[in-house]
Amino acid sequence: KGAKALSKVDDAKDAVRVGENILKNMNPKDIKYTQDSIANRFSTDRLGYRRPLVDAISELKTGVNPFQNSPIRVFEKNGNLFSADNRRLFSFKEAGTQSIDVIKVDRKDLDFDKNRHIENFFKEFFPKTKGETIKVRVGLK
């Protein structure tokens, strides 16, 4: 299913090329996670605030997209599509969003210093659930 989705990203008539990458709308259910767990808050913003996942999910459920103009980065591995943005993907899935903006990226486009989970993923780590589900950790770590 992921490989078919990826070719749809590549070949879609409504896809938009962004540099070497392709921007497209997809159902978040077709994208897998790259980790077993995620923090219950997003990373610190420029004002020092760590937004809770539940706030983003609540906004999405009311039709407000707090991630406007920030497509989910996806890449292919073993015929499946995986996300480099697990917390945002989780938020969309939990809110029941049917279509999200994704951008297909290559491994070379990912900043491994900021995305250690992606580096580990490419070193043959694979989520226990094969990327189908993810656990939300409680606490501020």
For the regions a protein language model found, what residue spans apply to each?
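Compositionally biased, low-complexity segments of secreted and virulence-associated proteins
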Residues: 1-81, 86-141
